Amino acid sequence: MLKIFAAPGSIALASVILLEEVEADYELTLLDFSRGEQKEAAYQAVNPKGRVPALITESGVLTETPAILFYIAKRFGADSLVGAHDPFVFAKIQEFNSYLASTVHVAHAHRLRGSRWTDDPEAIEALKKKVPESMTQVIRLIEDDLLKGPWTHGEAYTICDPYLFTISSWLESDGVDTTALPHLMAHRENMLARPATQAALSQIN
């Protein structure tokens, strides 16, 4: 059985949604970040990065959301979720998830994790103040150019969709005006209508 570690409000929700989508048999363990459980020896032995998600498989441990999403889809024979039928579609899915991981998630992290980049209290506050602007900018590209609708790549649901949904759930707290993002909000509603999303949310949030 697969075992996944997650935390409320974290990006790990995306992986749990996908596990529900493919009807995987898995065990969910929630970490309490407010108590620093991600830094304790028991979890450090699983993932020395001290972050979630982490997925324990029969072959070993996987970390990082793009890798875990890809593994789940391939493990359960859901090739359509990764665009395996077409090398270009496959690459576009990787491109989209790479943008979420390397750009959008990092912009969000400046609000809560500024100490990763600086120890200067004034600089940390400056990073926080910049978040509404920077998150609006990076998410605007998705709204205007990348989101095809009804799913991220058009008619076919892919591993990008739970990933984008999870990040979009942070936008209001990041100070982004979501009324100016009709496509993204329609995507959110489409995701909320899926039983897998509701099943994951009921366990984590």
PLM regions: where:
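Exported/periplasmic ABC-transporter solute-binding proteins
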Residues: 199, 203-204
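Structured helix-beta-strand junction loops
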Residues: 49, 75, 148-149, 194
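GST-like fold's C-terminal all-alpha helical module
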Residues: 100-193
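GST-like domain detector, emphasizing the conserved glutathione-binding G-site
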Residues: 1-126
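Residue-level recognition of oxygen-bearing side chains
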Residues: 67, 183, 196
